[in-house]
Amino acid sequence: MNLNLEKFKRDILFLPLGGSGEIGLNCNLYHYNGKWLIVDMGVGFTSEIPGVDVVAPDIDFIKQNIQNFVGIVITHIHEDHIGAIQYLWDELKLPIYATKFTSLFLKEKLSEYDFADEMKIIEVDIDKKLVLKPFELEFINLTHSTPEMSAILIKTPKGNILHTGDWKFEDKPILGKISNKKRLKQLGNRGEVLAMVSESTNIFQLSNTKNESDLLKNLKKVIKSNRSGLIVCTIFASNISRIITLSLAAKSAGRKVGVIGRSLYRIIKVANEMNFLPKGIEFVEEEDFGKYSKKELLIIATGCQGETTSGLWKLANDLQKNIKLNSGDTIIFSSRIIPGNEKAIYALYNKLSEKDVKIINSENEFVHLSGHYTRNELIEMYKLVRPRIVIATHGEEMHLAEHKRVAKECGVPNTIKGKNGDIIKIDSKNPEKTKVINHINLTNVAVDGKRLLPLNSHIIGERKKIAESGVFVVIIKVDRLFKMIDNPMISAVGNYDLLHEKLTKEMFEDEIKTAYNNGLIKISNPENGNNFDDDDKKETFLLKEINKKLGHIFQVDMGKKPFFVIKIIKI
């Protein structure tokens, strides 16, 4: 990494580790006077890697410079902003700063981890200031689908940066305060915002006249029109506003609210502690579902992205012991599809359709409302804040490019697309000179059970290969002179039926023996000199010969090669 930190010690630098060029994985770094600040540490979701649903950002840069980091600041509780903390914090051990609701949620979420007692989670009052030298931070309330979403105003002697987090302007939120436009306007009038770093996820939606209260009205109508069977609503688990909306809609239809999914229980517990839940709303435990008829229940379940460990997936696959889905039941997807999850979600749709249930989503009904701004709201934000520099983040390339174009149309002097790994120098004297000055290579990590694997790991590559083409195993027993003792042991998993396909086990054995013996002849050839002067070199050569032969056979017969596991065992 060719970055001289001393050279830029007095400069404001911005470095996104995740979320710029993709949806999710939000993790952004800010630098001034030799110190660094982390804003958010989220996960991303994937269906591309067998056995892996979640990926976390590459934090090698943080670890290499850990002595210069002052802490982690959290904007809000959504998984794409906090989900990586549980996997990465133990490597960093930095203090975490967040508002009361976010702090309580983090403590509850992380309580089951061994390092929970070590964690320092510090509560910050919203609309108040926090000093983490050399930074002075101000948490500014913005509306989102969860309460206490805070934009972070990062103040330095060289200029101030407004990191927006996820936001929208909503006049009648179901929960939480409205956006603090008064403070935003004040900042704009005073010319106090040098740069604004803002999300881009909803940039293509031009406008929206509806709010969560309007959604509540329509959900009441939808629920009342499906009277006979069970109603299951699946949402993003951390969307506490939607939990309240659905609970109120269920109550108006005379239904009790059931919950399936640990993460939902967690958010409800914290919301209850904060007195966010409306009076008269009671939640039915899973073990008590049998006490009610289906038409008396509305169940809120995890699984809106097709996750195979979720409550809805278990329902769809008859793995939920307390209640079953049947014809006449209704499933409502009160959520949007995160790019990349289409395959998993459509697979879930198909599984549910096998049960003849009715599926309702935002394509056929008004059952979801985004927590993100529309383009008109972004334009309003720029009129309020009037930044001299805009860095578009949190979105795929098309979102960032469109955000940059809109910001430019709004008269922002310098607009930049964020890109993971880019180190951007924010120039306070000449904002138009703000630019990328360097780049670090990043490799996200897959959350594989209890361990983290770099996405470029050979293990990930092998797993993909096995998933695509299966595995073909060959065990060869030899004596100390490498003479084969017995027929090779062969096993084919996920690619070939050795009993019924045209290439029989015996044929494979013959081909392997031929390749092996031909390899021995080449090894014994005097012309090869000292190329095979030790057993390791001999074994490596023989393995390559067998691999080459098997690869040719499979390519001719199947059109593709499986993952080969070939072992030579000396007896």
Describe these PLM feature segments.
Residues 195, 260-261, 362, 393, ...:
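Flexible, glycine/charged-enriched surface loops at secondary-structure junctions
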Residues 535, 539-571:
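C-terminal tails and terminal domains of large nucleic-acid-associated
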Residues 125, 419-420, 560-564:
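Short Gly/Ser/Thr- and Asp/Glu-enriched loop/turn motifs at secondary-structure junctions
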Residues 204-334, 338-363, 367-532, 543:
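Hard-cation-handling environments
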Residues 110, 407, 554:
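Conserved hydrophobic residues forming the short capping helix/wall of the S-adenosyl-L-methionine
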Residues 14-16, 121-123, 195-197, 331, ...:
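Conserved beta-strand scaffold positions in the cores of enzyme catalytic domains, especially
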Residues 2-73, 78-291, 310-324, 343-345:
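His/Asp/Glu-rich metal-coordinating catalytic cores
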Residues 95, 391, 565-568:
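Short glycine-rich phosphate-binding loop at a beta-alpha junction
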